[in-house]
Design a protein with these regions (language model features):
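Glycine-/small-residue-enriched transmembrane alpha-helix faces in small-molecule transporters
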Residues: 6-56, 88, 95, 142-146, ...
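Hydrophobic alpha-helical transmembrane segments of multi-pass integral membrane proteins
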Residues: 27-31, 53-70, 84, 137-146, ...
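Helix-helix packing/entry segments at the starts of transmembrane helices
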Residues: 30, 109-115, 183-203, 235-271
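Specific transmembrane alpha-helical segments of multi-pass solute transporters/efflux pumps
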Residues: 38, 73-113, 148-150, 231-249
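Hydrophobic/aromatic residues within transmembrane alpha-helices
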Residues: 49, 57, 100, 126-129, ...
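Specific alpha-helical transmembrane segments that line the substrate/conduction pathway
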Residues: 56-59, 63, 98-132, 173, ...
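Hydrophobic transmembrane alpha-helices of multi-pass small-molecule transport proteins
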Residues: 64-65, 69, 122-123, 133-155, ...
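Loop-to-transmembrane alpha-helix entry segments
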Residues: 78-81, 110-113, 129-150, 160-167, ...
Length: 305
């Protein structure tokens, strides 16, 4: 309908009691920032479990997220296409990301992986005609990516043809996560609780990859607490917040906010004693904050048809 808002009203009347949550856009912004802050803790928490093989770690943490959400399992009954896309998005992203880390230097692979926020910004208008991609969004998107590149690479990059397979895997990971994120709103409506089913299925597939591709390892009892924290936080709970944010908000703005992830992750490592603050982090952080500010100040789009 002409002139109708592209965004939905608040999903719960109770939320109207909070004056700082005035619309679904405000709620989506808060949910996205919460997910981003939780994801930023992944590196600091992951250091505690660096001795575990990657697929084992992902499998265990996603399984924790799925098991924790079993009380909502009735909401997991979604169309097969939705379940396949949700599971494929979560599992496929981590599979190709680890394939990239195995076949390319970590800095370059991680940098390519951070194309996903830019892809969300650039692809949103093609999937959602009610969203317009203006020059400020494009410039902010590339500024955010450059900022993320500076934070991740510390000014040191060396792309070599020998690592082409790893680079391609990182590109696929970025496209998979951007595609999964955008599809949560493009698919027929499904409850956010269904993400628990996606996590459990993805965790099972990751554990299968551990059995087939990695040396078998039995975690120690001292690992249990950290696995639970990861599964309830950056490798679980954050996915639920992200799903709801993408359904309610402006995908362009959320994409720009996502560039905060590597910056916040670095700052948390600095605070926890696992990293140091340098000029690259400060310069990249300035670009990322500028990009996020553009996204937050840009006027919301309206559907024209």
């Amino acid at each position: 309908m002409a002139g109708a808002s592209f965004y939905s009203p608040l999903p719960c009347p109770f939320l109207r009691n909070f004056p700082f949550i005035m619309s679904s856009l405000h709620l989506a912004r808060l949910l996205a920032l919460a997910a981003i802050f939780i994801w930023a803790s992944l590196a600091a928490l992951g250091v505690k479990l660096a001795h575990l093989p990657p697929f084992l770690l992902v499998g265990l943490t996603l399984a924790v997220a799925g098991i924790a959400s079993l009380p909502t399992r009735r909401s997991w009954r979604v169309p097969a296409r939705t379940f396949a896309l949700g599971t494929g998005g979560l599992f496929g992203y981590h599979f190709f990301l680890f394939l990239a880390f195995r076949n390319a230097p970590a800095i370059e692979a991680n940098l390519i992986n951070y194309l996903w926020p830019l892809l969300i910004v650039l692809l949103s208008p093609f999937l959602f005609p009610g969203l317009r991609l203006g020059l400020p969004h494009i410039m902010a998107g590339f500024a955010g990516f450059v900022g993320a590149a500076l934070v991740v690479s510390k000014g040191r990059l060396a792309f070599e043809a020998d690592y082409l397979l790893g680079y391609l895997a990182a590109v696929l990971a970025a496209f998979l996560w951007a595609g999964y994120s955008l599809a949560t709103r493009k698919l027929p409506p499904f409850p956010t609780a269904a993400v628990g089913g996606f996590c459990l299925a993805s965790g099972a597939l990751s554990l299968l990859c551990h059995v087939l591709l990695e040396p078998l390892v039995i975690p120690a009892w001292g690992d249990v607490l950290w696995v639970l924290l990861l599964g309830l936080g950056p490798m679980g709970g954050a996915f639920f917040l992200w799903d709801l944010a993408m359904k309610l908000g402006d995908q362009r703005e959320i994409g720009l906010l996502s560039f905060l992830t590597p910056l916040l992750s670095t700052l948390l490592l600095v605070v926890s004693g696992g990293g140091r603050l340098d000029q690259w982090t400060l310069l990249g952080g300035g670009l990322i904050l500028g990009a996020a500010l553009v996204g937050a100040l840009a006027p919301p789009s309206r559907q024209t048809a």
